[in-house]
Amino acid sequence: MKVIFLKDVPNQGKKNEIKEVSDGYARNYLLPNQLVKIATNNSIQTLKDHLKADQEEKELAKAQTKQIKKTLEELTLHFKLQTNDDKVFGSISSQDIVNQLKDVHRIEIDKKKFIHFKNINKIGINYVKVKLDFGIEALIKIDVKEVQKWNKN
């Protein structure tokens, strides 16, 4: 009997796989447990259409992720840190970066997506690596300017 697997079945087949199995095994175990459905011409065509639609969705999502990467790599985020006698006060956290991306550029990224992030406390240009979907990584440029802390002396 030709069947379409609805779920992964160990040592038998994977989800959406079309396979020939014995009639008894299909009727007595696979069908009652809703692990498979009988493969008819109509169900095979429906499966192919479904897989094609899933593939198109995946391609669209990947293209959108690449566009986000391009956008992220083109921007420069600007921050200011107070300094006094070449000492930097404070730092820039991943949450600060996420907030600026969200508020100013309308890009939402989870702060857990930053790779090997340490708070930024250096004046000048810094780079932060972000892991997006589909294994795509982007570098965000961060420009940190210094603001002299007023000295009462």
Swiss-Prot record:
A GO cellular component entry from the record: ribonucleoprotein complex
Gene Ontology molecular functions: rRNA binding; structural constituent of ribosome
Keywords recorded for this protein, A-Z: Ribonucleoprotein, Ribosomal protein, RNA-binding, rRNA-binding
InterPro entries reported in the protein's UniProt record: Ribosomal_bL9, Ribosomal_bL9/RNase_H1_N, Ribosomal_bL9_bac/chp, Ribosomal_bL9_C, Ribosomal_bL9_C_sf, Ribosomal_bL9_N, Ribosomal_bL9_N_sf
Keyword RNA-binding among record annotations: yes
SUPFAM superfamilies for this protein: L9 N-domain-like (SSF55658), Ribosomal protein L9 C-domain (SSF55653)
Entry similarity comment: Belongs to the bacterial ribosomal protein bL9 family.
HAMAP family xref list: Ribosomal_bL9 (MF_00503)
Function: Binds to the 23S rRNA.
Stated name of the protein: Large ribosomal subunit protein bL9
Organism in which the protein naturally occurs: Mycoplasma mycoides subsp. mycoides SC (strain CCUG 32753 / NCTC 10114 / PG1)
